[in-house]
């Protein structure tokens, strides 16, 4: 499931619209006062501590995780996402991708509004929660499916969500529930009966 994608750290995205240059979406610099935007690429420093990526769980049988294309264009955004955190250079950052049926405006999870391109879009974010927030908005308002990945400093890519190809709020045959009890909360034993036993009422 983990693949090498060294080009993800410096995707060559050079697109112009209405004679105004786009700001590189992941620039760590502040927004300039003029309309001439600069673009910078974040290159992660390979360290010994980050060379050993955590163990990656295999995908369920019958599901093939989609491959990440680092050349996918980014949404049009004449602002800044605040840059990636320092941990992106020593630990990881996150990439969310989706396909849009048309060019339309959407709200960025970091604040502000951007224009998603018609077709594939790719957005780098510092935190997984930002990907989840944007993905929820894409599905609820725009009816667009999405995927997001974790990218390590050595270029290794780990597919994260949806893990088995089906979003967690939908039923998926064969998916095992975690901590599932087929009873209502009122049928749990009294908490006083399990006090000092090291167990919880939902464990019985």
Curated annotation (Swiss-Prot):
- At the top level, the lineage of the source is Eukaryota
Biological process, per Gene Ontology: photosynthesis
Q: Which SUPFAM superfamilies match?
A: Photosystem I subunit PsaD (SSF64234)
Organelle targeting sequence: 1-44
Which keywords does this Swiss-Prot/TrEMBL entry list? Chloroplast, Membrane, Phosphoprotein, Photosynthesis, Photosystem I, Plastid, Thylakoid, Transit peptide
The places in or outside the cell where this protein is found are: Plastid, Chloroplast thylakoid membrane
Presence of keyword Plastid: yes
GO molecular function terms noted in the UniProt entry? mRNA binding; protein domain specific binding
This chain belongs to which protein, by name? Answer: Photosystem I reaction center subunit II-2, chloroplastic
Q: Which organism is it from?
A: Arabidopsis thaliana (Mouse-ear cress)
